[in-house]
Amino acid sequence: LEFRRVLFRSLSLPMVVLTAILFFIGVFVSWNIEKAPKGYFALLLLLDTGIVGVFLSLDFFLFYVFWEVMLLPMYFLIGMWGGPQREYAAIKFFLYTLVGSVMMLIAILALYFTCGHTFDMITIMETASTNLVGVSWWGMDAIKVIWVLLFIGFAIKVPVFPFHTWLPLAHVEAPTAISVILAGILLKLGAYGLLRVNYSMLPDAVWWFAGAMAILGLINVIWGALCALAQTDLKKLVAYSSINHMGYAMIGMAAVIAAGEMNG
């Protein structure tokens, strides 16, 4: 139990520090915003609240609430202060993220009802694997179904191929400060969620999907690099390079499982 609490802190602390630094920079980058500056900075602070809340929550209900709190500020920041295609970019981001949120909500409710009607992440971590042993839904292992639902929810945020198409447009159309936050923090939230939820709570299912994660990560690396090479727009270049970088993160997470197998 204590190790897992330390694990949460070790994962969360550097991300909270990174969030504070990038939002501090984002405020200065946005200092010359002329269109509704009060609304802009209010949404920026609300986005900051959602991100920090996700990193610090040990309750699944709060984790999900803060995850959703991030959605609306990003939608309005892109849709109101973005570039020429800002509305299309904002709607595409909203729809992709909404689909992931629905998947995550179904998985969270499934864990709630199978783990003693609790949202406490430590308790779920300790009981999920035991309570889900032998449980089948639609002819499939319940633990695998829940793992896949959570994976899709987080993979859209990473983003993992083929859920990556919202990122280049959102990155290009977003204001510069939001592009910095998008590349610097928001994409990492997906990888953070995979480590904190999928890996920590459902470790038995990870063994089944490590190979698929490695393949998806490899596709991200190759596709992101090739697309980045073809870009002339700096923001698009950063967007595709971010897809490439997160592919390495996916491969790294899969490699942890492979290393565990080799070491017994």
Predicted regions and their residues:
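Helix-loop junctions at the membrane interface of multi-pass solute transporters
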Residues: 28-36, 75-84, 152, 161-171, ...
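Structural signature of hydrophobic alpha-helical transmembrane segments
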Residues: 10-19, 60-73, 143-156, 204-219
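Juxtamembrane/interfacial segments at transmembrane-helix boundaries in multi-pass membrane proteins
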Residues: 1-5, 102-164, 169, 194-212, ...
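Hydrophobic residues within membrane-embedded alpha-helical segments of Major Facilitator Superfamily
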Residues: 15, 22, 46, 53, ...
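Alpha-helical multi-pass transmembrane bundles of energy-transducing inner-membrane proteins
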Residues: 39, 43-46, 50-133, 138, ...
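Transmembrane helix-loop-helix hairpins at membrane boundaries of multipass inner-membrane proteins
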Residues: 1-44, 117-134
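The feature identifies polytopic integral membrane transport proteins across all domains of life
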Residues: 38, 58-61, 89-94, 142-151, ...
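Central hydrophobic cores of alpha-helical transmembrane segments in multi-pass inner-membrane proteins
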Residues: 16-30, 47-49, 70-80, 149, ...
